[in-house]
């Protein structure tokens, strides 16, 4: 029965927990790869990889694909999305329960393909972009790139199946009276993300399928000798790749809105505008892909358009940031662990956005392209944006998932460790990038030694914070205080005080604006056997 529950589950909550476990494992593997990269770069010359430069690039590729496709997307969309989207709209489960199951179980074979690709021949040393001609049969002759492409195909299938499920559930299974404008912001963020996935993933599939054909069936889509063009691949990849960045960050916008609202004890400022800004960010995300390609020989008019369009994205993003700040302003602020992560997300996401504005300029990007300035830009947005919001989401919602509370003191120590560690890693990279240190190269001139050493020290701090985080989870599961009295949930995060005053147990409650905190914790398998009604 136990195996049957987890292998054949059609319950969204169980599948979400499987996603959490799987993505945590992949995240730790990706972190281990990044740690090896940072140790190799801690000093000039050969360090730990003993001059195996191909292995360095294999680690870079593995780290990126693991973090993007196996940590951020499965956790934010598959984990938090599966668990909380049905709860927030008053649905008993996802619309297609069996589809949900297969969309998860497509992922483990995908991971096996990816990890195998690193061990076949000399591994996939192409970076996550898999650009030809580096990824073509002349440069990577073995089966490694083919396995990586199969891995991308399978993860695309998994994401598309989940996407269909989320869209249908959000549009068709809302409770009575819940119009789209009354739908919670996190649900909106998952819906918008799902639409973006549906639009962008087929383009990636087309690109890597053509690459597979070039490698194995002698076609010439990207082979110059046969009349093909490798730049076409870059256009196809980045038409997926740029929306992908927003696919990773938009769910975090929804989570941040909930957490800011809860710990400020105020409704989110401008809730409708928050929905429209998410929509406009996702739409604009499809119109700016060539800003990744300023140095491939685009003409001046094209580059002028992409510079302007990229800068326009900062407008809806700024509206979101200032709306969060306005929500906090004048609120009854409680600096719990989730709120600390959220505040640091606001600050660090803004820093990452500002470096993005710099890179949007063609003239500057020509200088900064493929340097560590680009690396630190997207890590500030993703590593210190998306990942911090995952921690925030865990600390915010795990008491409702497990029915057990975590150790607040330890979790705040863990926050400060990872906050300092990640900033010590990535802030010095601005200076390295401005001075022209190139990406994906395992060696560098002596002049870059100082900041690289600082950066590698930050990596050690981050590893320590993750060790502490695993202990916090262990402590929560073993010793966490339950939120129940006489078998009734008295979860200290109860109903929203700006909607109603329902403080039955006279506790110092934290308020939330959505329905998931009004249920038992952990919630029952079908939380709403009787349909709820939205007032």
Swiss-Prot record:
Keywords: Calcium, Copper, Electron transport, Heme, Iron, Magnesium, Membrane, Metal-binding, Mitochondrion, Mitochondrion inner membrane, Respiratory chain, Translocase, Transmembrane, Transmembrane helix, Transport. Its cofactor is heme; Cu cation. It comes from the Eukaryota. Pathway: Energy metabolism; oxidative phosphorylation. It is a multi-pass membrane protein. Mg(2+) binds at residues 369-370. Binds 2 heme A groups non-covalently per subunit. Binds a copper B center. It catalyses: 4 Fe(II)-[cytochrome c] + O2 + 8 H(+)(in) = 4 Fe(III)-[cytochrome c] + 2 H2O + 4 H(+)(out). The chain crosses the membrane at residues 15-37, 58-80, 147-169, 190-212, 238-260, 267-289, 304-326, 339-361, 376-398, 415-437, 452-474. It is an enzyme of class 7 (translocase). Ca(2+) binds at residues 40, 43, 45, 442. Its EC number is 7.1.1.9. Heme a3 binds at residue 377. One of its GO terms (biological process) is respiratory electron transport chain. There is a cross-link at residues 242-246 (1'-histidyl-3'-tyrosine (His-Tyr)). Cu cation binds at residues 242, 291-292. GO terms for cellular component: mitochondrial inner membrane; respiratory chain complex IV. GO terms for molecular function: cytochrome-c oxidase activity; heme binding; metal ion binding. It is found in: Mitochondrion inner membrane. The keyword Cell membrane does not apply. Disulfide bonds: none annotated. Component of the cytochrome c oxidase (complex IV, CIV), a multisubunit enzyme composed of a catalytic core of 3 subunits and several supernumerary subunits. The complex exists as a monomer or a dimer and forms supercomplexes (SCs) in the inner mitochondrial membrane with ubiquinol-cytochrome c oxidoreductase (cytochrome b-c1 complex, complex III, CIII). Component of the cytochrome c oxidase, the last enzyme in the mitochondrial electron transport chain which drives oxidative phosphorylation. The respiratory chain contains 3 multisubunit complexes succinate dehydrogenase (complex II, CII), ubiquinol-cytochrome c oxidoreductase (cytochrome b-c1 complex, complex III, CIII) and cytochrome c oxidase (complex IV, CIV), that cooperate to transfer electrons derived from NADH and succinate to molecular oxygen, creating an electrochemical gradient over the inner membrane that drives transmembrane transport and the ATP synthase. Belongs to the heme-copper respiratory oxidase family. This is Cytochrome c oxidase subunit 1. It comes from Eremothecium gossypii (strain ATCC 10895 / CBS 109.51 / FGSC 9923 / NRRL Y-1056) (Yeast). The gene is COX1.
